[in-house]
Amino acid sequence: MARDSLIIKPLEDISVLSGFHCGIQAMDNFIHDGLEESIRNHYCNSYSVYLDSTLVAMFALGFDSLELDSDSIDEMVEGISTNKPELSKNYVDTFLSKHHYPALEIAYLAVEQQHRNKGIGQAIVNAIADMAQKQKMAGCMFLTVEAYIEKDYSAVPFYNVCGFEPCEYRNPNKETLRMYKTLYPRID
């Protein structure tokens, strides 16, 4: 799916999502019963995604901070991680001395059930990365996501395909896995 065929608009009227269903019950429940409160309370800004005039997806974004442990940073520096950022030679020591890194969180991403597995989600992630790189409001080095995991569904493989890596070990008592992706990958 070419991302230029998708139309992304700020979600100004939550009622456009009234008939929206991604097929994952917990996510559908949140979209219909919790998203509006999250927007109203400044947790995130939401967007609707159209293919021609058909609503095919929605997503929400919020500013975030990525905390990496020393093992993750070592893997990045050694090139083991695919998320090694491009850094100027003079900035490497400064980068390594940080404990938190500026990020943009994909708070929610859902594709309409009949449009799943068509490349729309991946095109949206690429568009979000472009948006994060082009915005001028704040520094942003990474995308983050709490990838949803339930008994019958896991978003982790999808985000792996999109270039995300876990930044924590899977906790079976938690319904998400925190993952990250660099916005400015180093090309060796």
Model-derived features: where do they sit?
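Short amphipathic alpha-helix that is part of the acyltransferase structural core
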Residues: 1-37, 41, 46-48
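Conserved glycine-rich acetyl-CoA-binding loop
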Residues: 99, 112-123, 151-154
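Conserved GNAT acetyl-CoA-binding A-motif
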Residues: 125, 132-147
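Conserved acyl-donor/pantetheine-binding loop and adjacent beta-alpha core of acyl/acetyltransferases
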Residues: 63-108
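Conserved beta-hairpin
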Residues: 44-62
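Short glycine/proline-centered loop/turn elements that form peptide/ligand docking sites
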Residues: 125, 151-155, 169-179
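Conserved acetyl-CoA-binding loop-helix of GNAT-fold acetyltransferases
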Residues: 117-131, 161
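Conserved active-site alpha-helix within GNAT-family acetyltransferase domains
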Residues: 138-140, 147-169
